[in-house]
């Protein structure tokens, strides 16, 4: 049986591949695929509607090789940044102080 961390890693990989390749390269997320992933998989972070301007900025920030898509490595950086943000939030919460 796999550990919770191993399960979490498997979910992160499976989630990427669930959305990648619907619009072209099966190993990259297009802007539309990234938008759908954010809306369906991270609704607490984006709210009910994904902000187009925010999505454009996010894609630009993540897209290190400027191919207008997010590859797995760029996606992993995105997840790491979200994880750091969550950790910072919980470290600052009154229950942890």
Curated annotation (Swiss-Prot):
InterPro entries: EF-hand-dom_pair (IPR011992), EF_Hand_1_Ca_BS (IPR018247), EF_hand_dom (IPR002048), S-100_dom (IPR034325), S100/CaBP7/8-like_CS (IPR001751), S100_Ca-bd_sub (IPR013787). Residues 12-47, 50-85 form the EF-hand domain. Ca(2+) 2 binds at residues 63, 65, 67, 69, 74. SMART domains: S_100 (SM01394). It comes from Bos taurus. This is Protein S100-A2. This protein binds two calcium ions. Ca(2+) 1 binds at residues 28, 33.
